[in-house]
A protein has these predicted regions:
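Short beta-strand element of the conserved SAM-dependent methyltransferase core
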Residues: 82, 98, 143-145, 157-158
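Short alpha-helix capping/helix-loop boundary micro-motifs
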Residues: 83-86, 91, 139-149
Length: 160
């Protein structure tokens, strides 16, 4: 099977809420700053909308691993914008470029887990430290948008 987009996720800015879990959408307009309408407080306030952090990408194999370890994660829970399938998470690396829909992205760097994950109902304050340790090197990859366009659920992910 060819790698493809399993799910596209975004969350509108909501006062006093963190940017996760994100909600599934069928299609997204993607600009150089990320998915239109998606809000990431950390990226916008602490990182000055760093273009290398425009998208957060996660693969379904990591979600499956975490489910097998007892964490009931669903696509979008970790704040990722794109959940990809049929691609090995550990094969992703900085500077790799991909065409997805009419967009082009470049993998930037790994996303470190943070304490905002306590907002997930199955984590909470009690388990957040264990969850952060569990997610080290598995939270997802940030990506820069090289070419704006549209991405739809089911779009093929091609390495370029």
């Amino acid at each position: 099977m060819e790698p493809s987009v399993l799910q596209i996720n975004k969350k509108l800015e909501t006062k006093k809420e963190v940017g996760l879990p994100k909600i599934s959408i069928d299609e997204a307009k993607v600009s150089l700053t990320g998915i239109d309408g998606d809000f990431n407080r950390f990226r916008s306030t602490k990182k000055n909308n760093d273009s290398k952090m425009a998208l957060l990408v996660l693969t379904s194999d990591i979600i499956n691993e975490l489910n097998d370890e007892g964490w009931p994660i669903k696509p979008g829970d970790l704040g990722e914008n794109l959940t990809l399938t049929d691609i090995d998470y550990r094969s992703l690396a900085p500077n790799q470029k991909y065409a997805i829909g009419s967009t082009k992205i470049e993998i930037s760097f790994i996303c470190d887990p943070c304490s905002n994950l306590k907002a997930l109902p199955y984590v909470g304050k009690e388990k957040v430290n264990d969850f952060i340790k569990t997610l080290l090197n598995r939270r997802g990859w940030y990506a820069k948008v090289l070419k704006a366009g549209r991405i739809g659920k089911g779009d093929i992910v091609k390495k370029i």
